[in-house]
């Protein structure tokens, strides 16, 4: 489950970053080239997704689909078809299916093409390449060196996201002060150096490192802007979204704690009610609502009243 979960998180990340790649026209009349059953059984979830993508663009009826309907047809025949692998994984990670669908659509929307068909071809090329990068990156027990193998928790998988995030921040900081024409060169050098340093002696044993570095370079080369500063800005924004998606995917969703009502104790000897104070509440003086919920209405100009003992509407709360 862990490998599937983080594989698909990275799948979404690379789909976000890959953007428009050099389109490789599919061959519609070529019969699907699927591996023999035994090899397919052993393939990872991501590898099978690669096969499904490629097979969909090679089916005989594909040539007769109007260009404007390419993506809708693809969505109907691939995205909406029940997939036992995805369904099984989604039962263990509820957000998986939504992230998978989002990855397809983000990659498609980011694709560039003068015609709907050309745009679809660019989408297929970008998404297939992204899936291939991931297929070689996160295979069972091939992600991290044996010294980092764990049984209960995918520590290595979590750590690498943090390392990528840290390396990105270091590289972006270094690139910001570089001349426009040198920004990506500076970024690439700093990024690779930071990754090597953060993984220390284990760098060579991380099989996905070369693919990661290649994906970074490909993402930069795929941007359509001509001006170096604009091209770098587009690349940096895409990679930032990717790392954010990876970081969010690795967080364990926890339901927010529901506020506890204040406890009103019996009257003390002096006649005053003793309140077991919860957290103080800041209320907008003008509108009587919680200050956090009133920031837009007051545009940050709230004059808060602090209520002790929980909610300002609860019995026992009082102003100060």
Swiss-Prot record:
Residues 1-23 form the signal peptide. The keyword Signal applies. It comes from the Eukaryota. InterPro entries: Poa_pIX/Phl_pVI, Pollen_allergen/Os. The keyword Transcription does not apply. Keywords: Allergen, Signal. Transmembrane segments: none annotated. Residues 21-45 are annotated as: Disordered. Residues 22-37 have a biased composition (Pro residues). Belongs to the Poa p IX/Phl p VI allergen family. This is Major pollen allergen Pha a 5.1. It comes from Phalaris aquatica. The lineage of its organism: Eukaryota, Viridiplantae, Streptophyta, Embryophyta, Tracheophyta.
């Amino acid at each position: 489950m862990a490998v599937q979960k983080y594989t698909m998180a990275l799948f979404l990340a690379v789909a976000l970053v890959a953007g428009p790649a050099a389109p490789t026209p599919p061959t519609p009349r070529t019969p699907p080239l699927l591996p023999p059953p035994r090899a397919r059984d052993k393939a990872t979830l991501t590898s099978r997704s690669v096969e499904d993508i490629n097979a969909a663009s090679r089916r005989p009826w594909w040539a007769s689909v109007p260009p404007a309907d390419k993506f809708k047809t693809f969505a109907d025949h691939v995205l909406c078809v029940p997939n036992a692998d995805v369904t099984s994984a989604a039962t263990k990670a509820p957000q998986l299916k939504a992230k998978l669908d989002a990855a397809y659509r983000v990659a498609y929307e980011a694709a560039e093409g003068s015609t709907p068909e050309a745009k679809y071809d660019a989408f297929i090329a970008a998404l297939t390449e992204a899936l291939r990068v991931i297929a070689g990156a996160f295979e069972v027990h091939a992600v991290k060196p044996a010294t980092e193998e764990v049984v209960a928790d995918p520590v290595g998988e979590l750590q690498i996201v943090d390392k990528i995030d840290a390396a990105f921040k270091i590289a972006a900081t270094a690139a910001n002060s570089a001349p426009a024409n040198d920004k990506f060169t500076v970024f690439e050098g700093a990024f690779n150096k930071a990754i090597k340093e953060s993984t220390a002696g284990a760098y060579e044993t991380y099989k996905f490192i070369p693919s990661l570095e290649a994906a970074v370079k490909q993402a930069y080369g795929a941007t359509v802007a001509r001006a170096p500063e604009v091209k770098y800005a587009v690349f940096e924004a895409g990679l930032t979204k990717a790392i954010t998606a990876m970081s969010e995917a690795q967080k364990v969703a926890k339901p927010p704690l529901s506020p506890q009502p204040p406890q009103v104790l019996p009257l003390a000897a002096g006649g005053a009610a003793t309140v077991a104070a919860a957290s103080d509440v800041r209320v907008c003086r003008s509108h009587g609502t919680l200050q956090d919920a009133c920031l837009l209405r007051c545009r940050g100009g709230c004059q808060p009243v602090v209520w002790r003992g929980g909610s300002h509407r609860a019995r026992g709360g009082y102003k100060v």
